[in-house]
Every structure is written in structure tokens, then in C-alpha cells.
Amino acid sequence: MVSSNFYKNLGPRKLMAIIDFLHDIIEPPKVHEDIVIHDIKILQEASSNDISFLSNHKYSEFLKTTKAAACIVPKNFTGEANPNTVLIRAENSYFAYGKLIDFFYAPIKSYHAKIMKSAIVADSATIGKNCYIGHNVVIEDDVIIGDDSIIESGSFIGRGVNIGKNARIEQHVSINYAIIGDDALILAGAKIGQEGFGFSTEKGVHHKIFHIGVVKIGNNVEIGSNTTIDRGSLQDTIIEDLCRIDNLVQIGHGVKIGKGSIIVAQAGIAGSSTIGKYCALGGQVGIAGHLNICDGVQVAAQGGVLQNIEACKIVGGSPAVPIMDWHRQSVIMKQLVKTSNSKLKK
């Protein structure tokens, strides 16, 4: 249930206005102009004053019994539904749901242009227009913060860092040796620009390699909570536009991640590897160092990648192999275990 402590309901909204707002509706249904929607709820909890959505077929059975006044469904949905529920067919029902959330809700907590008294901002730092700098934020010399940005409490922005317009840096984020584009969202506890894990070993002693690279992050990138991104030792660590990086991800020094790629929680990418454009790495995936993962590659959860992968391949397992080979290996292993157990019983 949505809590009014944190989010403000902007409704009610007329159903006709909702359909007009969503734009990508296929053959908009004819609805009475007086139908009013008060809230968004899941199918199981929706009442006759609510709108719901269906994007995962696993929940389609609830469409038969839901009390929702309307439901956004995929354009090719052919299942059964409550005859009293208006079906709104969308090109992408989950995307439409995301737009609907923005239409109905806004966070209670808001920020206005202000630098809190407890913040420490160097005289040589440049803070753009309409920025909010929270309690106990530290901004060092020669930092540039773009217009309309928010730096929340306890964050540290190191010397010379450049952050673009409309950035949101949540609490207790640390950023050093970094250049960050516009529209960045960096969630609480992320660490960006620290030295990578690089050593030279001489006579049994591991000597630290001084890192002289930086982290370059493109436009419209999201970095999850407690994710760590090391700066390069010689070549820069680069994250291109439109990337989405989940919580608790480790990105090693000199890694390059291509435009639009998605990295799910607890994944780790070792130094100097390249991830192509629009790749997807599942949870707990590990990528060894100095590899080239080409555009459009998908790696299933817990996959361990030890060699280069060609474009648009789907792999899984550890060591990672083509996904169908991995499934076959799993089936064969299961059969071998059954056979072995039956022999032991005899």
C-alpha cells in the first residue's frame, strides 16, 4: 500500500484523461466521461475506483476476479477478464504503468534551491542555479555542479569533480576523480573514483600502482546504492549514456560499459574489460579481466564469464557457455545424479 507519509496522491483523475495522457494506447476504448479513478493498485487489491496493470502473464488469472475499473494490458492480450473492467491495450503495458505512476504520485519530500549552513563548500567550487546542497555535504576546490542539481546530506564531492545539470546525488555518496554528465541519479552510499585494485608484486611484496585515470559517466545514468566504481590506473573507467547499474555492483579500474547496458545487483566486472552497448548482466554475474563482451550480450544470473563473447549471444553457467548448452548440461547433470543414487541404493 502506498503511504501518504512519503508520497502525495495527485488524483482523482478521469479515466479519459488517463487514456489521453498515456498516448501509446492501441485503439483507445470508449469510456464514459464521468468515470473517475482515485488510485493505482495491483489487480488483487484494486477496487471499483482504481486502475491496475498487467505486464507479466503469471498474474493474468487475477484479471478474471479483479474489481478494478480499468486495467492496462499488453496489446496482444487474449485472456479472460472481468467484464466490468475496461481493458486499455498498450504497446508496452509496463512502460505505460511507469508513466501512470508519474501521473498519479509525487514524493512528499521536495527540495528548493538552498545551501544548508552545515555544508562545506570551497570558495573555488562552482554551484549552478537552483541547486540544493544538503546538511554536512563537503564540496572541495574546483568542483563544478550543474544547474538544478541535488546533493543530499553527508555526501562528499572531491576536488575537481564535474557533475552536469539536473543530477541527484543521494545521501553519503563519495565521488572523486570523476566527470559525470547530465541527469545522473546516484543512490545512497555509492562510491565513485577511488583507486582500483592494482598491484605489482616484487619479492613477495604487493606494491600499490598509483592510479592516474578518472571515471567518466555519460548522460542519464543511474548508479545503485553501495555500488563501487574504481577509477582507471592509466586508461579511464567509462560508463556511457543511459546505463542502469543496480545496487552492490563492483566495476573495476579501466572498465568500459557501453550505452544502454543494464548491470544487476552483486555483479562484478574485473579491470580493463569492455561491455558493449545494450548488454544485460544478471545478478551475481562475474566478468574476468581484459575481456571483450560485444553489443547486445545477455548473461544469466550467476554466470561466470572467462572469455570474450560475440555480439547478441545469450550465455549462462560458470564458466559461461551458450544458454542452451548450459540448460543441457544442467539436465545431464541431474540425470547423472539420479543414476548414481539409484546405483548406490542397489
Curated annotation (Swiss-Prot):
Entries under SUPFAM superfamilies matching the protein: Trimeric LpxA-like enzymes (SSF51161)
GO molecular function: N-acyltransferase activity
Catalytic activity: a UDP-3-O-[(3R)-3-hydroxyacyl]-alpha-D-glucosamine + a (3R)-hydroxyacyl-[ACP] = a UDP-2-N,3-O-bis[(3R)-3-hydroxyacyl]-alpha-D-glucosamine + holo-[ACP] + H(+)
Disulfide bonds: none
E.C. number: 2.3.1.191
Keyword set includes Signal: no
UniProt record, GO biological process: lipid A biosynthetic process
Enzyme class label: transferase
Protein origin, superkingdom: Bacteria
Pathway(s) annotated for this protein in UniProt: Bacterial outer membrane biogenesis; LPS lipid A biosynthesis
GO cellular component terms listed in the entry, alphabetical order: membrane
Positions annotated as active site in the UniProt record: 253 (proton acceptor)
Keywords in alphabetical order: Acyltransferase, Lipid A biosynthesis, Lipid biosynthesis, Lipid metabolism, Repeat, Transferase
Family statement: Belongs to the transferase hexapeptide repeat family. LpxD subfamily.
Role played: Catalyzes the N-acylation of UDP-3-O-acylglucosamine using 3-hydroxyacyl-ACP as the acyl donor. Is involved in the biosynthesis of lipid A, a phosphorylated glycolipid that anchors the lipopolysaccharide to the outer membrane of the cell.
SUBUNIT field: Homotrimer.
Name of the protein this chain belongs to: UDP-3-O-acylglucosamine N-acyltransferase
Gene from which the chain derives: lpxD
